[in-house]
């Protein structure tokens, strides 16, 4: 069997560092799609970390082929020596629509994570100026958006010492949802106490895996 990819297909080629709670690019894209969000609708990630959800949402809005900027192993194989991958990439990029990337934003309390998010957005070939990022605590966050989505990957608290802090953050997400009743809130977590910590049951749930870690995707209308 011939490996034509090289690195796993989940690696799009724009991330240089994964942060403390890495979210696979393919899973981030799935979270955006499963939420029901459509390009042009407001989307804010209140725990954006290194920007994977924001980047995948922007690539989806633009209509960019996944992994277009990464190197594939088949590019070095003799059997593909007659293929001009540069032309293929140029043709794919010509089909993208950068003007469709709008109303996407993020925030996080960690300034280093935000700097990495900006780098990843640039390395994905996106214009970072149209994806505003803000350093702010979740409990202080207020966004000027309506009829849109909060989509996030909050910390899971896999270590017992972190659980109390993470569960307090889940309730902060509940309060954020209360402050923005017209925005749907979508969050993925491996913590079985998420709904109890949040403050109410989700309107929809979907079981997913982040690598080998079993998670649930909670959607609140």
Set out the residue ranges of the language-model regions:
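Conserved S-adenosyl-L-methionine
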Residues: 23-142, 158-159, 165
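Non-catalytic surface loops within mature trypsin-like serine protease
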Residues: 4-6, 111, 156
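C-terminal catalytic and target-recognition region of SAM-dependent MTase-like enzymes
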Residues: 134-221
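Class I SAM-dependent methyltransferase Rossmann-like catalytic core
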Residues: 13-23
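Short, flexible helix/strand-to-coil boundary loops that buttress conserved ligand/catalytic motifs
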Residues: 4, 118, 198-199
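Glycine-rich, histidine-containing beta strand-loop boundary motifs that form or position
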Residues: 4, 47, 189
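Non-catalytic substrate-recognition/targeting regions of SAM-dependent transferases
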Residues: 1-15
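A short alpha-helix capping/helix-coil boundary motif
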Residues: 7, 95-98, 153
């Amino acid at each position: 069997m011939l490996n034509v990819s090289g690195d796993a297909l989940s690696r799009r080629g724009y991330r240089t560092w994964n942060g403390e709670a890495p979210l696979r690019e393919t899973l981030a894209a799935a979270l955006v799609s499963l939420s029901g969000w459509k390009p042009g609708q407001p989307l804010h990630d209140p725990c954006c970390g290194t920007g994977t959800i924001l980047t995948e949402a922007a690539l989806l809005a633009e209509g960019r082929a996944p992994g277009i900027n990464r190197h594939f192993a088949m590019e070095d194989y003799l059997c593909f020596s007659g293929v001009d991958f540069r032309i293929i990439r140029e043709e794919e990029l010509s089909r993208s629509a950068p003007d469709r990337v709008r109303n996407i934003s993020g925030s996080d309390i960690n300034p280093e994570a935000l700097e990495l998010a900006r780098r990843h957005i640039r390395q994905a070939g996106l214009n970072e100026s149209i994806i505003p990022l803000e350093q702010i605590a979740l409990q202080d966050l207020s966004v000027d958006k309506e009829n849109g989505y909060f989509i996030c990957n909050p910390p899971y608290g896999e270590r017992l010492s972190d659980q109390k802090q993470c569960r307090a953050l889940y309730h902060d997400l509940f309060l954020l949802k209360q402050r923005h009743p017209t925005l749907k809130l979508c969050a993925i977590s491996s913590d079985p106490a998420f709904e109890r910590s949040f403050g109410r049951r989700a309107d929809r749930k979907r079981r997913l895996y982040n690598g080998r870690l079993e998670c649930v995707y909670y959607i609140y209308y």
